[in-house]
């Protein structure tokens, strides 16, 4: 599905009955979380709350509440087509040299697409139709959700943060939650290895006493949002990839108060800065783990300016014990990851991140095993190849006769093909999500790899068991007269 901006996407979802307008008054304080959660768990539509008490602004939730809507946001019609996006990313990440003239000619469409990705810069953008400055800046006028009873304050959850490090031309996009502190201040919660945090660290080293410019987009088009959470190659900007998904170049405009660029069709843009050394305690908040996280200090974002479209829409979500919207996104992006992994490791048959594993903390991989120790190589590959998996705590590797997405299959393989001592790999002192309170030190913990493959000579001294299967002729014969037996 192709679309121009968030409003066009909303209109097309509504025409397909994939979005529901809620005219009854629903409060962003806890109530929207409960309504959105009930609808998401039933596989229901995206929600547009048009009657938000005490606020003159509608709220959009559950935009990516089904895999189908994630696929539509990426310009496709089904989850199956997401594999093609993964193949495209794999080709852009590590292009193969042409094998000849015919092969080179066949690669021209991809080259043409890549060349057409560059963003288009415009002035007079819709997102700057209205401008709040100085005393007009008031974040409390936005219907920012309070998601859970123990949350310390309202929380911006779909803030698309744009930064740029010193001496860099490429702008980084990331989605980081932001705690409301006051009318013009938020707390920017980003982990130290994320792009925005790295840009800020580099800035402080280069300009230790100068303010760091930041822009936050609320209500970007889905392709731009999804590009920010997709493993885009470092040589390609997220804006360029979003243009590829959308089928047209991303329109960007320069911020009024700094030289960062934001989507021209964004609903709301926050412009401001981080002051080196100015931090505040963030949290606690209910998170995607299903628990409240501990309090930790992060930089304070001072908002100097708010710009917005006519009648802006506030885009929001909640996070909690799966399934939630991040978990659904994880299921969809799982399909994008597979071709990326398979290009580097062709022996991988399937790769699965169960949503109940908080989107990324556990992975099941099936392979065509080729040599002793092969499973351990795949474990190391998962942990190191894509930065999206640096927080994956558990990796289970199985043979290709196992369905990675069927726990009955996986548990059967684990209990019949694993010796706990021989087939368990423990790696200590590795990067761990600081929200993972199970680790002994914040941000640092262990990982476990489990080899549930059949063992080859060199891995065992015993004769390995042969799986029981029925004779094919008997199977076909019985299936042929099954309907005559009077059995269901």
From Swiss-Prot:
Compartments reported by the entry: Cell membrane
Cofactors, names only: prenylated FMN; Mn(2+)
Pathway assignment: Cofactor biosynthesis; ubiquinone biosynthesis
Record has rRNA-binding as a keyword: no
Binding positions for Mn(2+) per the UniProt entry: 172, 238
UniProt cross-references to Gene3D superfamilies, sorted A to Z: Single helix bin, UbiD C-terminal domain-like
Cofactor-binding details, from the entry: Binds 1 prenylated FMN per subunit.
Residues annotated for prenylated FMN binding in this entry: 175-177, 189-191, 194-195
Reaction catalyzed: a 4-hydroxy-3-(all-trans-polyprenyl)benzoate + H(+) = a 2-(all-trans-polyprenyl)phenol + CO2
Pfam family, one: UbiD_C
InterPro entries xrefs: UbiD (IPR002830), UbiD-like_C (IPR049381), UbiD-like_N (IPR049383), UbiD_bacteria (IPR023677), UbiD_Rift_dom (IPR048304)
Keywords: Cell membrane, Decarboxylase, Flavoprotein, FMN, Lyase, Manganese, Membrane, Metal-binding, Ubiquinone biosynthesis
GO cellular component: cytosol; plasma membrane
Single GO BP term: ubiquinone biosynthetic process
Membrane topology annotation: Peripheral membrane protein
Active site: 287 (proton donor)
GO molecular function (one): 3-octaprenyl-4-hydroxybenzoate carboxy-lyase activity
E.C. code: 4.1.1.98
Family, similarity comment: Belongs to the UbiD family.
Subunit structure and binding partners: Homohexamer.
Cited HAMAP family: UbiD
Function: Catalyzes the decarboxylation of 3-octaprenyl-4-hydroxy benzoate to 2-octaprenylphenol, an intermediate step in ubiquinone biosynthesis.
NCBIfam families hit by this protein: PRK10922.1 (NF008175), UbiD family decarboxylase (TIGR00148)
Name the UniProt record assigns to this protein: 3-octaprenyl-4-hydroxybenzoate carboxy-lyase
């Amino acid at each position: 599905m192709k679309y121009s901006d968030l409003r066009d996407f909303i209109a097309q979802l509504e025409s397909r009955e994939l979005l529901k307008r809620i005219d009854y008054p629903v409060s962003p304080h806890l109530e929207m979380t409960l309504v959105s959660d009930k609808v998401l768990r039933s596989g229901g539509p995206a929600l547009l709350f048009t009657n938000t008490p005490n606020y003159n602004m509608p709220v959009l939730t559950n935009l990516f509440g089904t895999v189908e809507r994630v696929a539509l946001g990426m310009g496709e019609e089904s989850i199956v087509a997401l594999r093609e996006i993964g193949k495209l990313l794999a080709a852009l990440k590590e292009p193969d040299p042409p094998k000849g003239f015919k092969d080179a000619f066949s690669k021209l469409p991809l080259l043409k697409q890549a060349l057409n990705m560059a963003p288009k810069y415009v002035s007079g953008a819709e997102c700057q139709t209205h401008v709040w400055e100085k005393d007009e800046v008031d974040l409390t006028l936005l219907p920012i959700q309070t998601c859970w009873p123990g949350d310390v304050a309202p929380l911006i959850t779909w803030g698309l943060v744009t930064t740029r490090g010193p001496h860099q031309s490429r702008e980084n996009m990331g989605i980081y939650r932001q705690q409301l502190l006051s009318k013009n201040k938020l707390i920017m919660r980003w982990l130290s290895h994320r792009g925005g945090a790295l840009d800020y660290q580099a800035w402080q080293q280069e300009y230790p006493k100068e303010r760091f410019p930041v822009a936050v987009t609320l209500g970007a088009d889905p392709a731009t949002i999804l590009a920010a959470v997709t493993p885009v190659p470092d040589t390609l900007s997220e804006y360029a990839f979003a243009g590829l998904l959308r089928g047209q170049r991303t329109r960007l405009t320069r911020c009024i108060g700094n030289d960062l660029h934001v989507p021209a069709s964004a609903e709301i843009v926050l412009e401001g800065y981080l002051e080196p050394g100015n931090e505040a305690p963030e949290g606690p908040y209910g998170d995607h783990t299903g628990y409240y996280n501990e309090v930790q200090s992060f930089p304070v974002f001072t908002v100097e300016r708010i710009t917005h479209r006519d009648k802006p829409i506030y885009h929001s979500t909640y996070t909690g014990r799966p399934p939630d919207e991040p978990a659904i996104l994880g299921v969809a992006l799982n399909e994008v990851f597979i071709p990326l992994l398979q290009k580097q490791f062709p022996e991988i048959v399937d790769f699965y991140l169960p949503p109940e594993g908080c989107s990324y903390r556990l992975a099941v991989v099936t392979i065509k095993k080729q040599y002793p120790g092969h499973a351990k190589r795949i474990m190391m590959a998962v942990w190191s190849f894509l930065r999206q998996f640096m927080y994956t705590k558990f990796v289970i590797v199985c043979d290709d006769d196992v369905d990675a997405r069927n726990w009955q299959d996986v548990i059967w393989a684990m209990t019949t093909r694993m010796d706990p001592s021989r087939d368990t790999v423990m790696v200590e002192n590795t990067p761990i999500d600081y929200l993972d309170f199970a680790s002994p030190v914040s941000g640092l913990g262990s990982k476990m790899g489990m080899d549930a493959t059949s063992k080859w000579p060199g891995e065992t001294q015993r004769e390995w068991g042969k799986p029981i299967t029925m004779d094919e002729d008997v199977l076909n014969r019985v299936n042929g007269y099954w309907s005559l037996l009077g059995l269901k």
